[in-house]
Amino acid sequence: MADDTASASEDATRSYYDTHDVDAFYDAVWGGEDIHTGIYTDEHEDVAIASRRTVERAADTVAGLLGKESTVLDLGAGYGGPARYLAERFGCRVVALNISEAQNERHRATNAERGLDGLIEVVTGSFHDIPFSDGQFDVVWSQEAFCHSSDRERLLGEAVRVLEPGGALVFTDLMAAEGASVEALRPAVSRLGVDALATVDFYRRTLTGLGLRRIDFDDHSGQLLHHYVCVTEETRRHRPELRNTISPAYLDSLLINLPLWVDAARREQLRWGVFHCRRA
Ligand SMILES: C[S@@+](CC[C@H](N)C(=O)[O-])C[C@H]1O[C@@H](n2cnc3c(N)ncnc32)[C@H](O)[C@@H]1O
């Protein structure tokens, strides 16, 4: 059971992702598969295509470790887009841990439709208390989930604990720029159920302290502005049909919150990219 700091953000996240409103929004705007920042190669590209490219790039960093005999743990697995990609590309087993049972139900159903339920196990639980024993996984993977944690030192400790020696931790996360004002970002960040984002320096320092080596950060911060402009425009474009599927209050709150992320990205107050490192 997580302590109070971690469990406050867990409750907020669970109730956020378990609502029908949030489910319908991610389905309409991201395609309900990958829900993280995209890497765009063309300004007219769909959010879903760019978001899939992020999975491909992150997977390239651990391709040498993955095959039919390996197992990946995906922390905060969402609807399972990354888990299915990894299982299909490498034939590896994936354990997908996620706190939202509503997402997990959809995740399991999609895996079964695609014949991937034999390779992917979907588990309900929190990355603050990973329900597996030490050193079990070849790769621990996560995309845009650590931003929901109010105890990131604890979750990183857990991620490293379950990684086998020589295994890799790879993750993407929304972060604050060094020196960005926590107060100024708070109105945007509050939608994630936390007070503040991590920084690149925090991750480097904490991962080093946990004994990880070859810590690399592929900096794609320049993608954030375009991504949030696209997501905001898509939300506005889908507004008429979203009005029929999600509550007006949630839609209005999104249309207030998303432009705050656009503004923060424009002011270069945010960072984003792919971290990858190895356990000694
Ligand atoms: C923005 S979504 C990203 C989903 C997925 N990783 C992807 O990229 O498509 C964030 C995910 O983190 C999960 N999450 C947040 N806090 C969590 C926690 N404490 N333990 C496990 N999962 C958590 C949410 O339920 C959600 O699925």
Language-model segments: which ranges?
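Class I SAM-dependent methyltransferase SAM/SAH-binding core
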Residues: 71-73, 81-129
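A short acidic, Gly/Pro-enriched loop at the edge of an enzyme's catalytic core
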Residues: 128-139
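Short, glycine-/aromatic-enriched active-site segment of Class I SAM-dependent methyltransferases
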Residues: 174-195
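A short glycine-rich, Lys/Arg-flanked "PGG" loop and its adjoining helix->strand segment in the class I
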Residues: 153-168
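Short alpha-helix
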Residues: 195-211
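Conserved Class I S-adenosyl-L-methionine
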Residues: 216-280
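Conserved alpha-helix/loop element of class I SAM-dependent methyltransferases that forms part
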Residues: 32-39, 45-68
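N-terminal auxiliary segments of SAM/dcSAM-dependent transferases
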Residues: 1-26
